[in-house]
Amino acid sequence: MSSPDIHADQGRRALAGGLSRAVLARAVKEAFLKLDPRQLTGNPVIFATWIVALLATVSAVAAVVGQQPAGFAIQIAVWLWATVVFANLAESVAEGRGKAAADSLRATRVTTKAKLIVDPNTGTWIPTPAHKLGVGEVILVEAGEVIPTDGEIIEGMASVNEAAITGESAPVIRESGGDRSAVTGGTTVVSDWIKMRVTAEAGSTFLDRMIAMVEGADRRKTPNEIALAVLLAGLTLIFLIAVVTLLGPGKFSGVALDPLVLGALFITLIPTTIGGLLSAVGIAGMDRLLKVNVLATSGRAVEAAGDVDTLLLDKTGTITFGNRMATEVIPAPGVRPDAAMKAALMASLADETPEGRSIIELARNAGLALEAPEGATAIPFTAQTRQSGLDHQGRSWRKGAVDAVYRTLGLEPQSIPTELSVAVDRIARSGGTPLAVSEDGVLVGVIHLKDVVKPGVKERFADLRRMGLRTVMITGDNPVTAAAIASEAGVDDFLAEATPEDKLRLIREEQGKGRLVAMCGDGANDAPALAQADVGVAMQTGAQAAREAGNMVDLDSDPTKVIEIVEVGKQMLITRGALTTFSIANDVAKYFAIIPAMFVVSLPALGALNVMKLHSPESAILSAVIFNALVIVALIPLALKGVKYRAVGAGKLLSRNLTLYGLGGLIAPFVGIKLIDLVVSALGLA
């Protein structure tokens, strides 16, 4: 493996695995650097905590200077600063994993000289630094050389190692024309040569965009994050008013409420948990996509994936394997099934096509395993004969198009056994391909070739249906074939004989009904639909236009990945919702846990509400502040990993999360604050 490939592989492992010491150390450093208030203004909850922490620090310093008791003020200040640092740490850890991967990707960039073609007629070239190449210029790349920048192959065909980008060490074929002409800077030509036209300036290549996406330089808040931030700001204002109104009851009851105590109480009541973890949840969602080798251009794309209502899936490669495979051999009347299977096998022994190999595999599964006899003559398939087979010692075996084999055997339609005619018609109606088989000039059966639905696809679609998603299969097949495959795969609907314009129209129709649409594509003709879709997943091996149109890029070029993308998006939304539920439930519980403890001395009637029996008003406040800080640390792993996702209906999911995180959020403060209070009082801290 070359050096760039090793660096890229290390970056992927950094994301796929846990936190390295280097990532954690950098995250801790950045958590303190983010104490700069200019970086906190976008998070009203944590910014409010920063302000109160600063006031608490001033109060503690004033107490020390004035030789007043300062222990309580110092502890409050320390734990309030810890709350801000822990919130910053959550975001820094999430960003740190992406930055580690970005550093590894950056290491894959090589400084190389390109062979710039200056005379197309003679092929004369001059060495030119890669960063000086301009869009539209043509360069030559030969075996063993690194492709210096992104481009489109205009001449030649080569085997290219794309491990530096995709992590897949097996070389792939890239050639001019079609959808396999795009090449990426940083990959290596293994064999042959190509001439390519440069499509990206230095600094805007696919690798540069990967690094920018991973680092999150353009990570703007998503609409849901903005809405949640507004909600948190509103709750912060409500609790500020609630704390200020305590001055009245305090004065009435003769309790002198220290501004430091009120400030600390205010911070314990506002939703600091979700406020501190909100950014981490969004960043971690993008990182989880990167773990499955998918790059998202923004958090908006990930969020949209979680809200998708309609999923458009290409049949070939996504729902089916894309290769016709033998599924059965139907014997002619009077022919034993094993004899028909053996004839089909003999006719396929010299066939190197996927169809021929599938017939051999079908026979092997039936207990037949033969090799081509020594001295046998292979009869290749031609466009004229439309059949292939094997000859050996005067015997012959053939398979091919039904009408071609019938014609070779001199059979008229009326002389074909009814059973075989019915079988041929059934296979054709179901979208399959019938192949007739003959042995020594006698018709012995029919092979059923079909585009096989991938294992587990039907179950995945059932899961998506339970999630409330509508699946639509897109295919160029005729409606009869499309209906048969759609029924077998379990999709909700299909679009047959589809053109790129049909895809675009369908997306607009779905969006017109208020639905969010996801689709994947790789061809230049998919670009309009990818751009129109709310979630457009382009294949890395696809055309440049497709990659630029989509808001996600699948480095593995696996169309089925769109299902995982939707699941990651939903997991991110569920995690955010669960932590929000837990945080708000926490605030409500802390309000009823702390307020009675603060006033129970002056208002004994509140003793009935003081269920926790905290040691003193000071220990109640200090314990709540400590709990408030520690709960952020405790939930960082959940924010990064995400709440475990299950493919169930929205109602069940809501009920489960309310029970687990809502009820848990109500109970946790009572248990946590009481335990901390016992420690605080035992150590004489308050």
Swiss-Prot record:
Keywords carried by this UniProt record: ATP-binding, Cell inner membrane, Cell membrane, Ion transport, Magnesium, Membrane, Metal-binding, Nucleotide-binding, Phosphoprotein, Potassium, Potassium transport, Translocase, Transmembrane, Transmembrane helix, Transport
User: What InterPro entries is this protein classified in?
Assistant: ATPase_P-typ_cyto_dom_N, ATPase_P-typ_P_site, ATPase_P-typ_TM_dom_sf, ATPase_P-typ_transduc_dom_A_sf, HAD-like_sf, HAD_sf, P-type_ATPase_bsu_IA, P_typ_ATPase
Catalytic reaction annotation: K(+)(out) + ATP + H2O = K(+)(in) + ADP + phosphate + H(+)
Q: Where is the active site?
A: D314 (4-aspartylphosphate intermediate)
Q: Keyword Ion transport on this protein?
A: yes
Pfam family, any one: Hydrolase
Task: Please state where this protein is localized.
Answer: Cell inner membrane
PROSITE patterns xrefs: ATPASE_E1_E2
The Swiss-Prot or TrEMBL record describes its family as follows: Belongs to the cation transport ATPase (P-type) (TC 3.A.3) family. Type IA subfamily.
Functionally, this protein is described as follows: Part of the high-affinity ATP-driven potassium transport (or Kdp) system, which catalyzes the hydrolysis of ATP coupled with the electrogenic transport of potassium into the cytoplasm. This subunit is responsible for energy coupling to the transport system and for the release of the potassium ions to the cytoplasm.
What protein am I looking at?
Potassium-transporting ATPase ATP-binding subunit
